[in-house]
Amino acid sequence: IMQPADFDITAYTALDDTAAYEKAGITTEQWNAKQAAAWYADGGDSETPSAYAWQGNNCWTLDALTAAREQGYDTVIADASFDADQTEAVHTGTYVVHTPAGDVTVLKEQSTLGTLAKGQATSTDAQAESSDAGRLARLIAQSAFYQMEQPYTSRYLLMTFSRTTEASWIDQVMSAFEQASWLNLTDLKTMAKADPYNVSDSVNPDKADDANTANTRSALRQLADSRHDIMRMATSILRNEIDSDEVSSLDPQALARQDANDTASHSNDPTQWIGSL
């Protein structure tokens, strides 16, 4: 499972303005690993899987990793921007970073595979990668090249799809990978337990995008304004209380269900349901 509502932890720390989030009605308790597990349990599953914090629109910095660890995430997913130092040969994408809140395991995506998996060409000159078929062929060929590069070395390479990737494309890629005899498909938990490529108390990300931070601040302002209007409606426009003997006449659905008596015993404070919006 991942952080609730795909909360952007990287933007949260880049903005560094907790008050702005709270004004918009967003608290840290809403996106921690405990809340993610609670939401998963609501679906009826008794066993809770591992929780992973996925990268948002900004890079994973030491502050962002610390915030993720404080919120209960000891493993995060990163794109190729996590380590600005690119090597010629591919390597296991597992890193361990010591943060003030504890160690965080970072699973970094392999850049070329990730680019192709997201439906993008590796360069503007790669005309053969202008179609799904071309990108899929390059993806399989690239994975074979990595195997030939170091045939006797076990490496864990991470590849992710984008949030908007179509299911049909995912099915094509995974079907092709399943038929590739040189590949061994595994899970995030196995990769997280692999010997890390690097262990340190710092990170070397690409430069953060200031535009993303500005967009976050603008979105929070809009949320705060909307929340203010909704709460004003709850306190100034809606009635604070309805007498229980009025409920049956005001709620025809209760009469149809023949549970008007039960409905009458419910709290009729509109701020309760307003607060859940």
Language-model segments: what does each one mean?
Residues 2-40:
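Glycine-rich phosphate-binding "P-loop"
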Residues 92-101:
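Short acidic-hydrophobic surface loop/beta-edge motif
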Residues 84-92:
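Short, charged, surface-exposed secondary-structure boundary motifs
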Residues 28-46, 58-82, 100-277:
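Catalytic grooves of carbohydrate-active enzymes
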Residues 53:
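Conserved, mostly hydrophobic/aromatic
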